[in-house]
């Protein structure tokens, strides 16, 4: 997990005077640390250092437990909203039949519509290596069929006995 920034609370604050902000966000001016601590204690709340680098440091009167809980909740919601982009792989062969090709194409379309990247792998066996143009033609066909919903991120290239192309979803949808 990420290192969370630690706010100093109550007696942990070391500055002789602070810029005090009330619990409703209203500025109460620059006061001594003791006066600020007394104001927080009278309200039954904590004195929390919000901006330690300011001159003088900005401190706010608030319920620190509630503040930490709200921060955790915000961080959790932000994590939930992030979309993990996954790379889905579809494997083809130079001699893939039409029906199989259509099924794989439908899967590729579904992956792209869900916002995932797709890695199209075309595997060569035996003597097929001598006729790589068939494989290239197959990948060009995939590229043409997915033109309206995807864009080629990595052009077809050979890696060992397979040709690989990466397609990502189009942004302007």
Curated annotation (Swiss-Prot):
Keyword annotations of the record: Cytoplasm, Initiation factor, Protein biosynthesis
HAMAP family membership: IF_3 (MF_00080)
Annotated signal sequence range: none
Cellular component GO terms held in the UniProt record: cytosol; membrane
Entry keyword annotation includes Oxidoreductase: no
Pfam family membership, one: IF3_C
Biological classification of the source: Bacteria, Pseudomonadati, Pseudomonadota, Betaproteobacteria, Rhodocyclales
Disulfide linkage: none
GO molecular function terms listed in the Swiss-Prot or TrEMBL record: ribosome binding; translation initiation factor activity
Annotated localization: Cytoplasm
Protein name: Translation initiation factor IF-3
PANTHER family per the UniProt record, alphabetical: TRANSLATION INITIATION FACTOR IF-3, TRANSLATION INITIATION FACTOR IF-3, MITOCHONDRIAL
PROSITE patterns: IF3
Listed transmembrane segments: none
Family, as annotated: Belongs to the IF-3 family.
Primary location class: cytoplasm
Gene3D superfamilies: Translation initiation factor 3 (IF-3), C-terminal domain, Translation initiation factor 3 (IF-3), N-terminal domain
Subunit description: Monomer.
Biological role: IF-3 binds to the 30S ribosomal subunit and shifts the equilibrium between 70S ribosomes and their 50S and 30S subunits in favor of the free subunits, thus enhancing the availability of 30S subunits on which protein synthesis initiation begins.
Coiled coil: none
């Amino acid at each position: 997990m990420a290192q969370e920034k630690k706010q100093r609370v109550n007696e942990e604050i070391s500055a002789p005077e602070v810029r005090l902000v009330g619990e409703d966000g209203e500025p109460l001016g620059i006061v001594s640390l003791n006066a600020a601590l007394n104001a927080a204690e009278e309200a039954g709340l904590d004195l929390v250092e919000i901006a330690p680098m300011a001159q003088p440091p900005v401190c706010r009167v608030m319920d620190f437990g509630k503040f930490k809980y709200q921060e955790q909740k915000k961080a959790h919601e932000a994590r939930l909203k992030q979309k993990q982009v996954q790379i889905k792989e579809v494997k083809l062969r130079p001699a893939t039949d039409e029906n199989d090709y259509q099924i794989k194409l439908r899967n590729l379309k579904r992956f792209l519509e869900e916002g995932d990247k797709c890695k199209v792998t075309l595997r060569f066996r035996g003597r097929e290596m001598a006729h790589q143009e068939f494989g290239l033609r197959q990948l060009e066909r995939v590229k043409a069929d997915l033109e309206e919903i995807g864009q080629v991120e990595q052009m077809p290239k050979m890696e060992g006995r397979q040709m690989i192309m990466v397609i990502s979803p189009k942004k302007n949808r």
